Amino acid sequence: MWPLWPAVPERRSQRLRQLAAPQRAACLAHPFVRGIASGSLPAAVFARWVVQDWHYLQTYLQVLGTLARTAPCAHARQRWGQMAVLTRDEELDLHRSFAQRFDIAPAQLAGAAVWPGTLAYSAFQVEQANRSYGRGVAALVPCGVGYVTLARALAAESAPADDRYADWIRMYSDPAFAQAVDWMESELDRVDEEEDALAVVYRNGVTWELRFWEHLWQGIPDEFNRG
C-alpha cells in the first residue's frame, strides 16, 4: 500500500499557514496570551500591549498606505485604503477605550516610549513593503491571521472573568475583523511573486509576532513613570 501523504493546500495562504503552524502554536501557548485567556494577566502587563500596539499600529497604517499605492489593480488599492480606515477609525479607537479602562491617560498613550522590539517589528514590515508589493503583503498578513487565530481559540474556551480581557477576545474574533483578514489572505494568494521568497517573509512575520508577545511579557520597568 502506498503511504498516505498529508494533502498540500491549494491556496498559497494556507500553505504558509501550515508552514508557520509551530510558531502559531507557540503564540497560543505563550504566558501573555494564556493570561488573557484566564483573565489572570496583571493589568500593568496588559497595559504594555495597549501602548506598544498603539504605536505599532501607527506604522502599520503607513504600510497599508504603501500597499494602497503599489497594489497592481484598482480593487486592491481600494481595499487597502479601506483597511487603513478600519484600522484608524475602529482599531485605534478600541485602543483608546482600553487605555481608559486600564487607567492610561491619553498623554501617556501618545507619549510613551516605543520599545526596541516594537520599532524592529515595524521596521521589518516597512522594509518589506518598500522592497515589493508581494513582500509587503506577506509581511502584513501574519499579524491579522495571528490575532484571528488566537482570538478564535480563546473564544472556544471559558470566558475570562475580567470583562476587559473578554472584550479583547470578542474584538479579534469578530466576524468583520475575520473577513478583513480573509481578504488579505486572498490577496496573498493572488500575488505574482516567487513563493519561496514570500514564505521566508511570512515566516519572519510570524516570528516577529511571537517575539512581540515575549517582548511585552518581559517588559521594561517603569514604562509609565519616565520623565
Description of each model-found segment:
Residues W5, V51, H75-A176, T207:
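Active-site-proximal alpha-helical scaffolds that flank and shape metal-associated catalytic sites
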